[in-house]
Structures are given as C-alpha cells and as structure tokens.
C-alpha cells in the first residue's frame, strides 16, 4: 500500500513513506533533548511544551482522548500548517488566537510502516481535531483510506480534499 501510494497517489514520492509530526523548533529541541515525543496532554502536564502551536479554540473542542495521544500527519502542507506557520502578529493569527502560531516550523519524520505496526496505533481519513473523525486500525482499514485525496496537492479539488489533507495517525503512548 505504501509503495503504491509513493508510485501512484502522491505528488511527492517520499511522502507516503513517513508519518509527520509538526511542531515549532523550540518544541523540537525539547523532543530531541529528552528523546521522547509526548502527547499534548503529557507535554502540558510535564511542562515540556515550549510553544503551544495550536489554536486554543480547536483544542478546547477536541476530545480529551485525542489530546492524550501522540499525533502525526500522513503528509506535510496541511491546512493547520498553512494557518499557523511562521511568526504572525496576534491580530493575524487563526481566528485571532494567540496560540495558533508556529514561528519556526519543524517536521519530525517517522517510518510510517514501522509506526503502523506498533500496538494501539490508529488512523483517520480526516482530522481528529474538533469532534474528530472515525478512527481505524489494521491493514484492511488502512487500504480503504482515500489516499488520492489525502495526498492531493492540487487547487482544483481543494474544497473536496482539504479535510483529507488533515488525515492523522495517533499513537496511544508518549
């Protein structure tokens, strides 16, 4: 499935080989220094999150079970990245939310095939933020994801594919 996605579904052949964790450089330093990638809930509790990248409005309406998991995207260039990337004056941030800011964005890449074999890993076809999307697990469910939409990078189908560009992989442990 991953090979087929690399060869036939993604505009960038290496994207389907990885799971992408999006964060700010200050958080990346913390992650690399500790050797651990924490869920939002654990990072907040342990006070290891230097920059709160996400919109408070979005986090407040996201299920606590989701923020208790480590989250990855199937691809870069997500709508979240578009809204939050780069230093922005607070008045220009997503819905005026001061937290929705990633001054120096960093993606940490993880081997997707290995990640998917870990116990408890699930994935969704769209974002887990807000009310969240249905989560799946297993090879059969993975094969049914709409990778043509998940990896689509065109403007022609943007209204259809935008939510799929947020597709996520979640791991239950930090």
Model segments located where?
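Active-site-proximal loop/hinge segments that shape catalytic or ion-binding/gating pockets
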Residues: 1-174
């Amino acid at each position: 499935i991953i090979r087929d996605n690399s060869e036939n579904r993604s505009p960038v052949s290496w994207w389907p080989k990885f799971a992408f964790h999006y964060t700010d450089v200050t958080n990346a330093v913390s992650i690399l220094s500790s050797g651990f990638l924490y869920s939002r809930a654990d990072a907040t509790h342990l006070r290891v999150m230097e920059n709160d990248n996400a919109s408070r409005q979005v986090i407040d309406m996201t299920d606590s079970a989701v923020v208790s998991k480590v989250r990855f995207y199937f691809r870069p260039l997500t709508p979240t990245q578009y809204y939050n990337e780069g230093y922005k004056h607070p008045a220009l941030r997503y819905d005026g939310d001061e937290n929705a800011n990633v001054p120096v964005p960093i993606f940490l890449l993880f081997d997707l095939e290995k990640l998917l074999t870990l116990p408890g890993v699930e994935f969704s076809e769209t974002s887990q933020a807000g009310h969240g999307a249905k989560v799946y697990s297993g090879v059969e469910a993975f094969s049914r994801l709409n990778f043509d939409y998940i990896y689509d990078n065109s403007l022609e189908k943007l209204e259809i594919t935008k939510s799929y560009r947020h597709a996520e992989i979640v791991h239950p442990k930090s």
